[in-house]
């Protein structure tokens, strides 16, 4: 299987690529270098951008109508080169703009270096683009590395480079970066949120679409994790991780392989690594904030929250270091490699192989029925459940919710949205007790041998107890509202 994958490098690191021992050891002959220039154009009214397109005119070669973002329903995975809507064979051919003239929005100028790499897995053709993006109002450096060849060879090359340089799939295409620079608006990510499986026909198709989408979302969110950044980056990274792990487990009855199991274990470790940062964010933004507001002038509370902020800083040190380390880049590349290689096909034969071709809707119904039955059994005697039982019920609800998000696009949208809203309310009601339990543990971890600190911890614990009491009935009400009639996957 031959593939072409696009990666991004910081320009400074791109300048060191040729000196990398791996490249020097495997390069075929000398690298060739040539000037590179590309211009992106649109009408003054932005008619092409409104369709998610730009006209791309390279210095050499044919002009193309470049797609800025993949269509929402299209299959996608990280490092996938941006799509081409049309190729113009002659200079006078133009995209349809209702007669409006085209104007240049932004341009790339730099160098294109090409070289081959001879690996045991095969020969890889590499193309390094390094230079500057320019618009009327701004400019910035940019670099891209395109690797083409047999899949095992391309992934081996990407892995070897990423072990020593910050190579990763690009967060945006050069064309989208050019559009953002010209418009002054931020670049738009390839993918966010839950996956769109609406066009999936088979079980394997749905699996590939969901995993590819969620790998992209995870990459996008993790890239935003930084000191002083929005707490949503860590939160959404953990959500993407949980959604991705849910997909691996939900489809495991049909799509299974040791490489997928290994990937799941590595993703679980990342969830744990980001946990402390998220816990301290929730504590400081929730109960800690409410206590600080209620005791605005109390030095003991202020000291406790300063200690909490110091713990959060340490947790973010670990999170930022993790996503900047080679291990994180290699995890993304290994996950992409498994997705593209599809090793479960070789392991499947007979009925398992046929199961890969099962209609996605039929498989979705069976999977959701199993999760629904488990949730209803766990909550059958809701009023008598212990705290531990409610915690397990919350986890069952979360598993059902993530599975429902994957299959919802295959069914009636209105019914699916209602079901997910009601399930989310149940999760919120059950989650309060969990958040409070975590907050109580964090507060106790801040305890010190002083009367002031002990008093402040006691205030936080008391606040936690009061919050649980105030919301005790929310989960019960949400449970009664979530009835069997809400199951969007039943019927036609």
Regions found by a protein language model. Name each.
Residues 1-492:
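Function-determining surface determinants
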């Amino acid at each position: 299987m031959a593939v072409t994958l696009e990666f991004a490098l910081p320009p400074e690191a791109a300048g060191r690529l040729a000196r990398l021992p791996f490249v020097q050891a495997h390069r075929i002959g000398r690298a060739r270098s040539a000037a590179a220039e590309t211009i992106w154009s649109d009408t003054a009214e932005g008619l092409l951008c409104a369709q998610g397109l730009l006209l791309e005119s390279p210095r050499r070669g044919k002009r193309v109508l470049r797609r800025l973002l993949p269509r929402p329903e299209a299959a996608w995975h990280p490092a996938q080169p941006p799509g081409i809507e049309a190729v113009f064979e002659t200079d006078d051919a133009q995209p349809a703009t209702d007669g409006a003239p085209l104007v240049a929005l932004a341009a790339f100028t730099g160098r294109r270096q090409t070289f081959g790499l001879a690996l045991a897995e095969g020969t890889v053709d590499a193309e390094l683009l390094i230079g500057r993006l320019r618009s009327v109002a701004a400019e910035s450096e940019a670099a891209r590395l395109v690797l083409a060849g047999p899949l095992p060879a391309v992934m081996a090359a990407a892995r070897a480079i990423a072990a020593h340089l910050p190579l990763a799939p690009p967060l945006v295409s050069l064309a989208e970066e050019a559009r953002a620079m010209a418009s002054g608006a931020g670049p738009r990510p390839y993918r966010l949120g839950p996956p769109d499986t609406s066009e999936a026909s088979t079980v394997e198709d749905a699996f590939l679409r969901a995993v590819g989408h969620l790998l992209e979302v995870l990459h996008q969110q993790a890239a935003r994790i930084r000191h002083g950044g929005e707490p949503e980056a860590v939160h959404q990274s953990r959500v993407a991780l949980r959604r991705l792990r849910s997909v691996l487990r939900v489809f495991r009855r049909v799509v299974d392989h040791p490489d997928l199991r290994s990937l799941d274990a590595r993703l679980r470790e990342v969830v744990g690594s980001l946990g402390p940062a998220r816990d301290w964010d929730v504590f400081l933004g929730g109960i800690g904030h409410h206590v600080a507001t209620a005791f605005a002038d109390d030095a003991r509370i202020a000291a406790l929250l300063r200690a909490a902020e110091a713990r959060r800083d340490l947790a973010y040190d670990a999170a930022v270091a993790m996503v900047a380390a080679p291990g994180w880049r290699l995890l993304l590349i290994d996950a992409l490699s498994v997705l593209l290689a599809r090793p479960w096909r070789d392991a499947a034969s007979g009925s398992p192989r046929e199961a890969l071709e099962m209609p996605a809707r039929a498989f979705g119904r069976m999977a959701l029925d199993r999760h629904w039955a488990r949730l209803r059994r766990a909550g059958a005697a809701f009023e008598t459940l212990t705290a531990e039982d409610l915690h397990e019920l919350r986890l069952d609800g979360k598993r059902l919710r993530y599975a429902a998000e994957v299959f919802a696009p295959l069914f009636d949208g209105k019914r699916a949205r209602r079901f997910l809203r009601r399930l989310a309310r149940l999760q919120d009601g059950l989650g309060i007790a969990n958040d409070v339990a975590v907050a109580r543990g964090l507060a106790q971890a801040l305890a010190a041998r002083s009367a002031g600190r002990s008093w402040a911890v006691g205030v936080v614990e008391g606040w936690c107890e009061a919050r649980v009491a105030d919301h005790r009935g929310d989960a019960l009400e949400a449970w009664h509202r979530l009835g069997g009639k809400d199951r969007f996957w039943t019927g036609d």
